[in-house]
């Protein structure tokens, strides 16, 4: 078993770490940075860019630059959040088997495939850093991710060629990194405000045990939403001044997004910033420029309700943990958006104590994931991690009611059973609708899947005993089974979530990803062969021009023809590696006569020496 890497697969940025030498270390990417933008771009030349290179070209290629893909991970196309994402994101979101996917140049990609490309870059960079193959990982998800979102994340890892040993909640991971060396028992709160999600978790740490007491959050609240408030403000101001709806222009919208994100960051240290976007658009009267000052106070007023929402979540989670805020020992701030001064001020005022900012908010989650990897590998001893289910799990029963089988806040892994019966006389089958959520009515909760148990023996209603068992593993992924206790017949469903991907489709995507890797390697080989050929043609031409007089005409023409043939091959975009190598070999052979002529000339120019000391011998 090789090294297990911990991956924080973020909405905005991703990070990775490894546990070695009794400590967790952040792994820098090939660009030398500790975080990698979670961005994938498709260029007109057919290239796929990931990370910094994708981010750099986003303004000129907005419709084919995919960011914030985590926001639609495991999301059904008909959900309100999908409609909201569709309005905000410049790329096309489409329906694929009822789930969200994206369309680029007529080809449909699932969020899992896009996320897999990010994970593949992280995997390759980790292999470069560690000097060995990496096949296993622990990947983090927001604590409030539902079953389908967790399953989709694991599928992304599989497509990327990773065996995902564990899916771990982000705040739990942060607490693991923070609390590993804590001997005294502490009740800590992790406030995790990332690029696209918000989680708050209350945990008890001490004596190498990290136990989650309660968790809550919003899978659609994060730094992106703060950016969107600035975008809306700037677009509204621009429209009132010019009459132009700038958000209809995808290139202008991408420039606005980058400007809003930069303004947000600048306002964390400055009281005012200027947004200056020349030639943002044009109309019949000529080009238009967007120049606007934004104060910290205005930014705070634009995002006031978002901050208020996070405080509301803190209140409910502390209550769920059975604690008061005075019993919280430490508040650990995680996620890049916790750098916003007003966010810190709000949390500090509510909890009434100084915030712990000793951890790097961008890196601590990946560090914790690598520690969990160390636990699974056996490198970290005697650490016990007790996580909980973020939402209740149950089934739909008579009258459209949700009956809970596993309650929210149950420590996982967990297995629970309940006995149900039929609603009608001589009912031959029952349909089991699996649900996740806290609402009383089934229709108000998220449907995770449905299966039928057939062959129930004829009997009056209420007599058959149908035992339904919910089995949730350490990744928070669910299997549900139903058994007729009279006949022994049973049926089970491993919840595949709303990803819309079958095992065969996932397998195909794994092969496609591997195939793409081979294609890239072949393209690289062609490029290297082309570069070598171009270099040889250039050097030989230079030498031929210089020493042509030392060759007979036939030899000179033969070499020139070989140079010309190789140059033509280099210019041919469709030339194969074999063709380039063949033409290179022919030139190398023809150029041997040139080398001989150059050597003869050098020998002729050197003064003759006595050969008294020369020994006549063969050298092997």
Curated annotation (Swiss-Prot):
Induction: By stress conditions e.g. heat shock. Gene3D superfamilies: 1.20.1270.10, 3.30.420.40, Actin, Chain A, domain 4 (3.90.640.10), Substrate Binding Domain Of DNAk, Chain A, domain 1 (2.60.34.10). One of its GO terms (cellular component) is cytosol. Keywords: ATP-binding, Chaperone, Nucleotide-binding, Phosphoprotein, Stress response. The modification Phosphothreonine is found at residue 197. GO terms for biological process: chaperone cofactor-dependent protein refolding; protein refolding. It comes from the Bacteria. It holds the Pfam family HSP70. Residues 597-620 are annotated as: Disordered. SUPFAM superfamilies: Actin-like ATPase domain, Heat shock protein 70kD (HSP70), C-terminal subdomain, Heat shock protein 70kD (HSP70), peptide-binding domain. Disulfide bonds: none annotated. GO terms for molecular function: ATP binding; ATP hydrolysis activity; ATP-dependent protein folding chaperone; heat shock protein binding; protein folding chaperone; unfolded protein binding. Acts as a chaperone. HAMAP family: DnaK (MF_00332). Belongs to the heat shock protein 70 family. PANTHER family: HEAT SHOCK PROTEIN 70KDA. This is Chaperone protein DnaK. The lineage of its organism: Bacteria, Pseudomonadati, Campylobacterota, Epsilonproteobacteria, Campylobacterales.
């Amino acid at each position: 078993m090789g090294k297990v890497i911990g991956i924080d697969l973020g909405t905005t940025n991703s990070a990775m770490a490894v546990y070695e030498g009794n400590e967790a270390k952040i792994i820098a990417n090939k660009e030398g940075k500790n975080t990698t933008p979670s961005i994938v771009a498709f260029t007109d030349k057919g290239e796929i860019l990931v990370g910094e290179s994708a981010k750099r070209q986003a303004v000129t290629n907005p419709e084919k630059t995919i960011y914030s893909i985590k926001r639609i991970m495991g999301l059904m196309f008909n959900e309100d959040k999908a409609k909201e994402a569709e309005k905000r994101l410049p790329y096309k979101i489409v329906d694929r088997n009822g789930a969200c996917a994206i369309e680029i140049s007529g080809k449909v990609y699932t969020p899992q495939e896009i996320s897999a490309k990010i994970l593949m870059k992280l995997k390759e960079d980790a292999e470069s850093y560690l000097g060995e193959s990496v096949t296993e990982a622990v990947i983090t998800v927001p604590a409030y991710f539902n079953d389908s979102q967790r399953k989709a994340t694991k599928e992304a890892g599989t497509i990327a060629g990773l065996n995902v040993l564990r899916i771990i909640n982000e705040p739990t991971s942060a607490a693991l990194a923070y609390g590993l060396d804590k001997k005294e028992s502490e009740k800590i709160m992790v406030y995790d405000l990332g690029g696209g999600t918000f989680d708050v978790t209350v945990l008890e740490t001490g004596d190498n045990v990290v136990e989650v007491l309660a968790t809550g959050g919003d899978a659609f609240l994060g730094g992106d939403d703060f950016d969107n408030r600035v975008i809306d403000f700037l677009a509204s101001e621009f429209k009132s001044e010019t009459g132009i709806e700038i958000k209809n222009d995808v290139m202008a919208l991408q420039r606005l997004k980058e400007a809003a994100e930069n303004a947000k960051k600048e306002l964390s240290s400055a009281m005012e910033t200027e947004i200056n976007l020349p030639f943002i658009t044009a109309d019949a009267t000529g080009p238009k420029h967007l120049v606007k000052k934004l104060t910290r106070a205005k930014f705070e007023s634009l995002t006031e309700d978002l901050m208020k929402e996070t405080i509301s979540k803190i209140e409910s989670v502390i209550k769920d943990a059975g604690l008061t805020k005075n019993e919280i020992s430490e508040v650990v701030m995680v996620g890049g958006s916790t750098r916003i001064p007003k966010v810190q001020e709000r949390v500090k005022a509510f909890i009434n104590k100084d915030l712990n900012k000793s951890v790097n908010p961008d890196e601590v989650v990946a560090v914790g994931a690598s520690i969990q990897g160390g636990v699974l590998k056996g490198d970290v001893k005697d650490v016990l991690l007790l996580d909980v289910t973020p939402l209740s799990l149950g089934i739909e029963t008579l009258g459209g009611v949700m009956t809970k089988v596993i309650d929210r806040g149950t420590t996982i892994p967990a297995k629970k059973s309940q006995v149900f019966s039929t609603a009608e006389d001589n009912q031959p089958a029952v349909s089991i609708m699996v649900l996740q959520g806290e609402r009383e009515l089934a229709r108000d909760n998220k449907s995770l899947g449905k299966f039928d148990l057939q062959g129930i023996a004829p009997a009056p209603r209420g007599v058959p005993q149908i035992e339904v068992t919910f089995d949730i593993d350490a990744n928070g992924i669910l299997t549900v089974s139903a058994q007729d206790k009279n006949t022994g017949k049973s049926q089970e469903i491993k919840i595949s979530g709303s990803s819309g991907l079958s095992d065969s489709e996932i397998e195909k995507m794994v092969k496609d990803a591997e195939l793409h890797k081979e294609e890239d390697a072949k393209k690289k080989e062609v490029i290297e062969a082309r570069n070598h050929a171009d270099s040889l043609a250039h050097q030989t031409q230079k030498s031929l021009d210089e020493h042509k007089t030392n060759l007979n005409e036939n030899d000179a023409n033969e070499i020139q023809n070989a140079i010309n043939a190789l140059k033509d091959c280099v210019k041919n975009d469709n030339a194969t590696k074999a063709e380039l190598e063949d033409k290179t070999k022919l030139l190398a052979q023809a150029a041997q006569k040139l080398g001989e002529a150059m050597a003869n000339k050098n020998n002729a120019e050197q003064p003759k020496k006595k050969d008294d000391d020369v020994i006549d011998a063969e050298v092997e």
